[in-house]
Regions:
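N-terminal binding-site loop/beta-alpha segment at the start of enzyme catalytic domains
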Residues: 1-84, 99, 112
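Short, contiguous strand/loop micro-motifs
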Residues: 28-30, 89, 142
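Feature marks short, surface-exposed loop/turn motifs that line or immediately flank catalytic pockets
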Residues: 30-33, 60, 92-94, 120-125
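Short, surface-exposed alpha-helical recognition segments that flank or form part
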Residues: 34, 57, 93, 143-147
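Generic structural signal for short, solvent-exposed loop/turn connectors between secondary structure elements
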Residues: 62, 89-100, 148
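A short, structured active-site edge motif that brings together acidic residues
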Residues: 80-94, 115-122
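Glycine/proline-rich, positively charged
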Residues: 99-149
Length: 149
């Protein structure tokens, strides 16, 4: 018999809105070591076995594949949308385009809502293809609500 997480035993935290968020979830970062397909398989398995929080981000470059997984778990009646808590994040180069970035994540994930949308990293930055992870755009400046929101 396959084991599942006892969903009622997963601790939750209450957000200032009153909404509950599972204290344990699945992060979908893995694009540095795993293919989007491998991450997708992990997401399907995690949801099947009881995970209810899925943490995504456009910069991981796998939201479209995760969207396909979400569609499948809903079609397979593994869970309903209301049973999941989905997060995503705006990346460094989209601080001035938060709404457009969020809409893109919604489209890629195949959702009408994201439960929580974070600023991924509060410093604007541009990473050219193939550059090192520490390279910075010389015009970067720290994130501020006044400047970027």
């Amino acid at each position: 018999m396959e084991k599942q997480i006892e969903i009622l035993n997963v601790p939750k935290r209450v957000l200032f809105t009153g909404e509950e968020i599972p204290a344990v979830g699945l992060g979908t970062f893995g694009s540095d070591k795993y293919s989007a397909e491998q991450v997708s398989e992990a997401v399907y398995g995690a949801i099947k076995y009881g995970y209810r929080l899925v943490d995504c981000a456009a910069v991981y470059q796998n939201e479209k594949q995760i969207g396909e997984v979400l569609k499948k778990v809903f079609q397979d009646k593994v869970v309903t949308r209301e049973e999941l808590f989905i997060t995503s994040k705006v990346w460094n180069d989209r601080h001035r385009e938060v709404e457009a970035a969020c809409r893109q994540s919604l489209e890629d994930l195949g959702l009408s809502t994201i439960d929580l949308y974070f600023v991924h990293w509060p410093f604007p930055n541009y990473h050219a293809p193939g550059c090192g992870g520490d390279s910075r755009n010389p015009d970067s400046k720290p994130f501020s609500v006044e400047e970027f929101m």
